[in-house]
Amino acid sequence: MDASGCMKSLLLAATQYRAAKTPSNAALVQRSLEVISGLKLTRLFASNQILPSECLNCLVELLEDANIDPPLTLSLVTLLSQLASDSETREALRDTYSLTNVLAGVVHRSSTNLSDPVLLQSIQLLQRLTYNVPVFCAGANIDELISFLMHHVQSTEDELTIPCLGLLANLCRHNLPIQTQIKSLNNVKSFYRTLISFLAHSSLTMVVFALSVLSSLTLNEEVGEKLFHARNIHQTFQLIFNIVVNGDGTLTRKYSVDLLMDLLKNPKVADYLTRYEHFTSCLGQVLDLLHGKDPDSSSKILELLLAFCSVVELRHTLRQAILEPSGLPVSGNTRFVTRSKTFEPSVALVHLSNQPLEGSEDCSVLALQLFKEVFEDVISSGNSASAEHFVDLLLPVLLDHLQTPEQIVDELLVKKKCERMVKTINVLTVLCRDDILKTHASKLLTASQCVSLIEHQFSYSGIDAGFGTKVVDSKMCKLAADIILKTLDLMSRLKQDVPGMEVSFYKILQDQRLITPLTFALTSDYREQVQVGLRILFEAAPLPDFPAILLGESIAANNAYRQQEKEHASKRIQLQSPLISNVTVSSSSCANGDESTASNVQELIQKLHSGLEVKEPITDMRISDIMDIYEQKLSSLASKETRLQDLLEAKALALAQADRLMAQYRCQRAQAESEARTLAAMLKDAERKNEELNVLLKAQQVESERAQTDIEQLFQHNRKLQTVAEEHEMLKKSSVDLLQRYETTERQHKDLRITCNSLNKEIEAMKKLNESLKQQNDRTAAQLVESEEHRKELQQQLHDRESKIASLQQKIKGLEEKLKAQQKEKNSMEETVDVLRKELSKTEQARKELSIKASSLEVQKSQLEVRLEEKEALVKLQKEELNKHSTMIAMIHSLSGGKLSAEAVNLSL
């Protein structure tokens, strides 16, 4: 069965089960859930299609029903957990279908049985849904959930304690209403004491969850000032970095990174971190985590490094750690080896920036953002020479990101590719701000790459659809416009350094397809995009063929479209409530409109026939014109009829959705009434509790004193642990020194033994060599006698050759006269070459000044090039003749000097 059939069978089974909750219907729903779970249709549910949306709505409604069977509830939670692994589906479940509130109700119903697996899986799914997302705290289910979490965290520790504490950390993070609600509870002091006691827990996950909740609730209060005071903050930093480096898993590392990022947003804590003496070594250990970790961990580490860049002093240290890793201490797991090139942070970052598009986490975008921050710090500190090697390593990867990809079908992959291109162009633009780094970029980047990138965005992103395109309709259109404008900005910075870049730059500026990206940039809400658009506009406005009028019309049309969208949105908000009651009336009016449209068409046909009968004497050409006009009117009426039909179908769908909304509104109204009753009861309880506050005040003072003593004892215990850790580090360093000394002495002993063996071998070889030399001495004495006889024969041959040399000297004199004549011709040719070079330099200067009008001067340029080639060919021929003469003279001189034998002279020359 295909996916659509499975989803339809699930909807049918759910409808039957809601009508009659029998075991057979429950088994049918259970079987449908198992089939869909086995198909792994995560990406299909992430789409906005109607059938998957109906399925998700059905699953949430079934889970919201308090009367369904527990095994069916467990299957529903398991399937939703599987679907929530996709980010888009998770966002839809959280925002569109309000799964958070529904799961809170499931937790409340299952809280009576703590061993129920539904409770554990629901809390884990809630933890995944609420991670890094603020939760709206209105509703009785959320209040009951917070009460259950706080009560269970303070109870006996079990397998639910860590998930409950993690979910509570999610709910408290960046959520002021929930923080206020927790602080207003009576048992908040004992809750703080429980969290502080968790800081000494053996599980690092428990420690980071507790510290995250404490930082969210108490960072700006008296308890937080004591906990994160200057005396204790360094121990807190050491604890967090220890969890980041040695965490129990990806989840623990994520929460510890988020905790450190939240603390960095506090200026006082950020200042403490800049003065933390072990920050450099901790940063080195964090950078080592980039090697061989899963994409989730790598992305969180990159987010942490980007958070460090928000503080200027920390960004300096991070830049030195990436570009100059030799100054960093090696981490504990590699203390006996030196840091190799493959484990340098720069190499790891380059590798992460080149991850494939199919990855679940886009580490490449984060790595490119980090490169931008590092290079900005390099340029601001004036230390660009230290980044040259890293730039040479990074540039091929950056240029590979700019390569136009093959046809990618998946829209998500296309979006990822475009985002990487934008970040890559940002990095290249930052490099062009410095002259030294700019030269490295200009050597590899070519004009053809930039032009092909822009043409690809024009062709495949739909941005060249013509004037009047609604650029705000498509996210891909926004990304394409951003790529085009930032590429042009990069070309404007490199137009004097890259050959052909200037001509290509001005040619694209006069292209009418540039109107849509410029319109998007100049009407954007982002300052950076507006500035880029203005820079491109200032470059393009003086050009003769720049379509300035079209740009103005496009900006006006885009502004009008935005204003129209705002008006429609306000009308939709105003008409949202009456729309539900008037859907049937609208659909009936649409049907009447269709009937009137059909009658109008018949009347037009009758008028056309009557007009033709009356005006028969008119020429055939006039009749054909009238026919064309009426045919156009008929086609427009037919298109209006189809649009009305589509509108009717949309109204019917809206009616069905309105029915579902009304059911949800009735449920919410019942919940609101129950909440009102609970609030009235709470008001009575509050009046009663106000009378008891005076009695509880003294008890709370005693508890606060006890908590103060507990905190002091914990601080003393932490100081003792710190001293033990320092002693342990000193012992480690001494053991490392002793081990290194032992290894050096061992190596020296081996070297001496090898040299001794080699010397013995050399002595034996010298003895053999001495005997062979004696034999050679006897042979050379005999050869000496033979060579003396041969010398006498050569003396006789020398006298014969001297006579031949005298005859050749006469020929040399004649050749010298010819050489002088050739020399004069050479001088004259050099003068002509100088003249031609001056003309060439003048032509080159004129070409640079008239680069914008290069198209009109191409004919003259080609003529000058032809003349130059002729002159260069003539000069080349003359040089060849001169080379021939010089070789002849060299041979003559060598013959006159007696360096060649008579047999080696080539008389053919």
UniProtKB/Swiss-Prot annotation:
Keyword DNA damage: yes
Positions of transmembrane segments: none
Pfam families, A to Z: CIP2A_N (PF21044)
Motif (Nuclear export signal): 602-616
Any GO molecular function: protein phosphatase inhibitor activity
Chief place of localization: cytoplasm
Residue runs in coiled coils: 630-888
Keywords tagged on the record: Chromosome, Coiled coil, Cytoplasm, DNA damage
Subcellular location: Cytoplasm; Chromosome
GO cellular component annotations of the record: chromosome; cytoplasm
A single BP term in Gene Ontology: chromosome organization
Self-association state and partner proteins as the record states: Homodimer. Interacts with TOPBP1; forming the CIP2A-TOPBP1 complex.
Family label: Belongs to the CIP2A family.
Role according to the record: Acts as an inhibitor of protein phosphatase PP2A. Together with TOPBP1, plays an essential role in the response to genome instability generated by the presence of acentric chromosome fragments derived from shattered chromosomes within micronuclei. The CIP2A-TOPBP1 complex tethers chromosome fragments during mitosis to ensure clustered segregation of the fragments to a single daughter cell nucleus, facilitating re-ligation with limited chromosome scattering and loss.
Name of this protein: Protein CIP2A homolog
Highest classification ranks of the organism: Eukaryota, Metazoa, Chordata, Craniata, Vertebrata
